[in-house]
Amino acid sequence: LKEKRLAEKQRQKKYLMQQLLTGKKRLPGFSGQWEIKDFNQVFAFGVTNTFSRECMCEDSTGVKNIHYGDILVRYGEVLKLSEQEIPSLLSDIGAKITTFVEDGDVVIADTAEDLTAGKAVEVQETHGKKVAAGLHTMLCKPIKDCFAPGWLGYYMNSETYHKQLVPYIAGVKVMSISKGNIVKTHILMPPIEEQAAIAEVLSTADREIELLQQDIEQEKQKKKALMQLLLTGIVRVKT
């Protein structure tokens, strides 16, 4: 039953993203045209590193490192460092990093095994932690005070934005997109108050999905523990 509810919540979020991030459906109280900005009008590129997994560890201190594989598999649209632990670079390697990710920056995975290349995360709640953009990523630093927290993370993972990327994603065994091509895309820019309202709706949907996933995982662990007890004879079924 909970799995069905989870699937339904995920469908609802997808529908909300399709409607709200394109301007097809407007939230109450908002009207007027959205601006369309060229990528270069919105972002400047920051420096990334090329360190592999072997240069990373699960240490809670040190320079955090956003690896493209984690963007593709582990992280959602908005990566809040106050809520999610991410790997660190080994201390001697972390000492070499001079460019850091700030709140509101977008980190894009430029490489994948399929058309998921271009998946992005918006980083929030760094709270003074040093964070680097890692292997096969683009670090995109937006112009200040034009975007509400969460807007770019949700918009740049929407179908409407990803469709712009698809013609430029190239490769045979490995697919990738270049900086030279990603700058040919454009970004939709509603008024900042509307961005904030949309991001809040989608963030609420994310929280509901996350709570259901946690419930499902806890039930699985309980069943697994009970099976172990039954199989070892520690607990016997009453007959």
Regions found by a protein language model. Give the residues of each.
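Active-site/binding-pocket entry motifs
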Residues: F45, I71-R74, D114, C146, ...
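Amphipathic alpha-helical coiled-coil/heptad-repeat segments
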Residues: L1-Q33, K184, L188-T239
